[in-house]
C-alpha cells in the first residue's frame, strides 16, 4: 500500500502534468493579492506612457490566457478595468494593422517590426542575430508544460523559417 507521502507526490505530479497546479498557484496568488490590496489607498495616477504600456501588456496577457496575471496587473497598476479601444492604441502608437485580423496583440507586431529592422534596412543591433539565440540550444528552454512558441506562431513557422515571412497582423509605422 502507498504511503501518504507517495500519494502526495503522485497527486502533485499528476496536477503538474495536466497544468492544473500552475493554474491553482496563479489563482491563489491573485486572490491573496486582492485580499491584501487596500482599496481605500488611492493609486497614483498613471502617466500616458504607462497607460499605453500596461494596455499592451494586458492585451498580450489576455490573448495568452494569463487571466490571473492580467487581473493582478490591473489591480496593482491602477489600469482601468475596461480595456482601452484598440483603435485608440493604434493611433497613439502611430501603428497600423497589416491585415483585418485584429485578434493578435499589438506587441507581436511591434516585436516583429524590430526583429525585421527599420524601413531603410538597418537592423536593430540589440535584437539581431546571435543575441536572440543561446549558443547551446538547450539553454533558455523553460521547463514549462507550455509549448516554447505560441500555437499561432508555430503554425506559421512551419510554413517559413524566415521571420519576415511570418504572418504578423500589426507592424509599427515609424
UniProtKB/Swiss-Prot annotation:
Transmembrane segments: none annotated. The keyword Cytoplasm applies. The modification Phosphoserine is found at residue 144. It is found in: Cytoplasm, Cytoskeleton, Microtubule organizing center, Centrosome, Centriole; Cell projection, Cilium; Cytoplasm, Cytoskeleton, Cilium basal body; Cytoplasm, Cytoskeleton, Microtubule organizing center, Centrosome. Its main location: cytoplasm. One of its GO terms (cellular component) is centrosome. The keyword NAD does not apply. GO terms for molecular function: identical protein binding. Residues 49-81 form the LisH domain. Residues 129-174 are annotated as: Disordered. Residues 1-104 are annotated as: Necessary and sufficient for homooligomerization and localization to centrosomes and pericentriolar satellites. Residues 147-167 have a biased composition (Basic and acidic residues). PANTHER family: CENTROSOMAL PROTEIN 20, FGFR1 ONCOGENE PARTNER/LISH DOMAIN-CONTAINING PROTEIN. Belongs to the CEP43 family. This is Centrosomal protein 20. The gene is CEP20.
Amino acid at each position: 500500500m502507498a504511503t501518504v507521502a507517495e500519494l502526495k507526490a503522485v497527486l502533485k505530479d499528476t496536477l503538474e502534468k495536466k497544468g492544473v497546479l500552475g493554474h491553482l498557484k496563479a489563482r491563489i496568488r491573485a486572490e491573496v493579492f486582492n485580499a491584501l490590496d487596500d482599496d481605500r489607498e488611492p493609486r497614483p495616477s498613471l502617466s500616458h506612457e504607462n497607460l499605453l504600456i500596461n494596455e499592451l501588456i494586458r492585451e498580450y496577457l489576455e490573448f495568452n490566457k494569463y487571466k490571473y496575471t492580467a487581473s493582478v496587473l490591473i489591480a496593482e497598476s491602477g489600469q482601468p478595468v475596461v480595456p482601452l479601444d484598440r483603435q485608440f492604441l493604434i493611433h497613439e502608437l502611430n501603428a497600423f494593422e497589416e491585415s483585418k485580423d485584429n485578434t493578435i496583440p499589438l506587441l507581436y507586431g511591434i516585436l516583429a517590426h524590430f526583429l525585421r529592422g527599420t524601413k531603410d534596412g538597418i537592423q536593430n543591433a540589440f535584437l539581431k542575430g546571435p543575441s536572440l539565440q543561446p549558443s547551446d540550444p538547450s539553454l533558455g528552454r523553460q521547463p514549462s508544460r507550455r509549448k516554447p512558441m505560441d500555437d499561432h506562431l508555430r503554425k506559421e513557422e512551419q510554413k517559413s523559417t524566415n521571420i519576415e515571412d511570418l504572418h504578423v497582423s500589426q507592424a509599427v509605422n515609424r
